[in-house]
Amino acid sequence: MGGSLIMKELNLKHEAKRYGCAVLAATIMALNIKTFVRAGGLFPGGFTGLTLLLQNIFQTFMGIAVPYTLINVLLNSIPVFIGLKFIGKKFTISSVCVIVLSGLLTDIIPSQPITYDTLLISIFGGLINGFCISLCLIGNTSTGGTDFIAIY
């Protein structure tokens, strides 16, 4: 009886850590995109960069402002399905939380460029993005996209 209570408490702590890391990483990622990446006109690797590139193409050539969340969720739909099928339900659900939350925050947070120096933006944007990915992996979740493929 006492062992079962301890296991439930440990599981609760583990889930709190998982979702705490997910929320923190999603928030920092959105801030990074709005303060560094977009300010420098950069397109990082992975689905984040592809999402920003598609947004830019829609805006430039068609005059349509497509939300970041919409493109990012559509791009991540296939890796999410693969994650559900082959990696695990808990991991995939927490990763979907990161994908959706970072997308929504990227759409909501106003753009606040810190600097326009491309070298500084590249260095700090990359460091912050790497920190967010590490934070997700520590919490046993991912930022979606190519992370699903790499883990599978």
Each language-model region and where it sits:
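Core subunits and conserved enzymes of cellular information-processing
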Residues: 2-152
